[in-house]
Amino acid sequence: MADGQMPFPCHYTSRRRRDPFRDSPLSSRLLDDGFGMDPFPDDLTASWPDWALPRLSSAWPGTLRSGMVPRGPTAMTRFGVPAEGRSPPPFPGEPWKVCVNVHSFKPEELMVKTKDGYVEVSGKHEEKQQEGGIVSKNFTKKIQLPAEVDPVTVFASLSPEGLLIIEAPQVPPYSPFGESSFNNELPQDGQEVTCT
């Protein structure tokens, strides 16, 4: 998939199913991507009880956050989420994984591609006649790949809830030929060697 395009969806039957809510770093990022769309229409919030409005309009300090959280650097560091446009660093041995909320787009309206060390996710709705006007939604999100990830191994899947899960295994570290962690020198005359 490096420097090429692959129409969505892409499925790998040999891949086991994963639970995106299992990993705590992942669950803190699930609702980060709102693409500038309000999570609730203005007329809907007018009928909410007084006790619910502060919870909907302020930053929630829980694991999952609403789409109304300010996107400042303090919010990012407080929740352990990397700066905007950067992908989270993978843990050693864990696959690199990012979720993008695309619930308002159909699978055929999404495109996932890799180019120049980035994964680019884009979506576009066809124009629709709605409320006396024409409505069209589109977005593009670029996510930088970590150095430990090979762009050819990136794959994406769409959950029933509308989360686009982008994953790639880490490239195992390698050592140049002749370098290794064990000592490959022969013992000198003064050294004792035990063979078993």
Swiss-Prot record:
Keywords for this protein: Chaperone, Cytoplasm, Methylation, Nucleus, Phosphoprotein, Stress response
Cystine pairs: none
Gene Ontology MF terms in the entry: protein homodimerization activity
Biased composition, class Low complexity, residue ranges: 23-34
Residues recorded as bearing Phosphoserine in the entry: S24, S57, S87
Listed Gene3D superfamilies: 2.60.40.790
One GO term (biological process): cellular response to unfolded protein
Positions carrying Phosphothreonine: T63
Cellular component terms (Gene Ontology): cytoplasm; cytosol; nucleoplasm; nucleus; protein folding chaperone complex
Polar residues bias: start-end ranges: 178-196
Asymmetric dimethylarginine sites (modified residues): R71, R78
InterPro entries documented for this protein: A-crystallin/Hsp20_dom (IPR002068), Alpha-crystallin/sHSP_animal (IPR001436), HSP20-like_chaperone (IPR008978), HSPB8 (IPR043254), HspB8_ACD (IPR042790)
Pfam families reported in the protein's UniProt record: HSP20
Residue ranges of every copy of the sHSP domain listed in the record: 74-185
First-listed, main subcellular location of the protein, grouped into a coarse class: cytoplasm
Annotated localization: Cytoplasm; Nucleus
Family membership noted in the UniProt record: Belongs to the small heat shock protein (HSP20) family.
Subunit structure: Monomer. Forms a ternary complex with BAG3 and HSPA1A. Component of the chaperone-assisted selective autophagy (CASA) complex consisting of BAG3, HSPA8/HSC70, HSPB8 and STUB1/CHIP. Interacts with HSPB1. Interacts with DNAJB6. Interacts with BAG3.
Function: Involved in the chaperone-assisted selective autophagy (CASA), a crucial process for protein quality control, particularly in mechanical strained cells and tissues such as muscle. Displays temperature-dependent chaperone activity.
Protein's name in the database: Heat shock protein beta-8
Species annotation: Bos taurus
Gene: HSPB8
